[in-house]
Amino acid sequence: MEKTTTQELLAQAEKICAQRNVRLTPQRLEVLRLMSLQDGAISAYDLLDLLREAEPQAKPPTVYRALDFLLEQGFVHKVESTNSYVLCHLFDQPTHTSAMFICDRCGAVKEECAEGVEDIMHTLAAKMGFALRHNVIEAHGLCAACVEVEACRHPEQCQHDHSVQVKKKPR
């Protein structure tokens, strides 16, 4: 999916839900809108804090129910290793396999379609008689910006942000 505006993304989600005959409630739409404004993954509780700006009465079950719906529809992915959620940038391709690249330094999460891996996963699943419904592959490492920061040997003379604390220690 090309870079789309938030309004285009929400309109696309509404259209998909109408085609599937499922209800995209105003609350679900608002959670999706908030997700679309994030640069990367966000925890349910951070999402709740954002939702409370518009809906002060919102409680954790409100967010979790909305996230469950958005997960079922393929609009978001759960990043299991960080217990966070990220907008799916490929939700116009409902059967895709996602590869999530998670930066252990800054926490950025980038999604890529893993077409070649998808075939391998289906072959392995078929050997076991396993019926795959959805694949998400998570890989941890450093994003390009953090690789550059970690390679920097002169922090006092560079333009890098050395203040970011490592989110997860490498194994």
From Swiss-Prot:
Entry annotated with the keyword Transcription: yes
CDD domains, per the entry: Fur_like
Keywords: DNA-binding, Repressor, Transcription, Transcription regulation, Zinc
Entry's Gene Ontology cellular component terms: cytosol; protein-DNA complex
GO molecular function: DNA-binding transcription factor activity; DNA-binding transcription repressor activity; identical protein binding; transcription cis-regulatory region binding; zinc ion binding
Keyword Transmembrane helix: no
UniProt-listed InterPro entries: FUR (IPR002481), Fur_C (IPR043135), WH-like_DNA-bd_sf (IPR036388), WH_DNA-bd_sf (IPR036390)
Annotated Gene3D superfamilies: 3.30.1490.190, Winged helix-like DNA-binding domain superfamily/Winged helix DNA-binding domain
GO annotation terms (biological process): DNA-templated transcription; negative regulation of DNA-templated transcription; regulation of secondary metabolite biosynthetic process
Role description: Acts as a negative controlling element, employing Zn(2+) as a cofactor to bind the operator of the repressed genes (znuACB).
Family affiliation: Belongs to the Fur family.
PANTHER family linked: ZINC UPTAKE REGULATION PROTEIN (PTHR33202:SF6)
UniProt-recorded name of the protein: Zinc uptake regulation protein
Native species: Escherichia coli (strain K12)
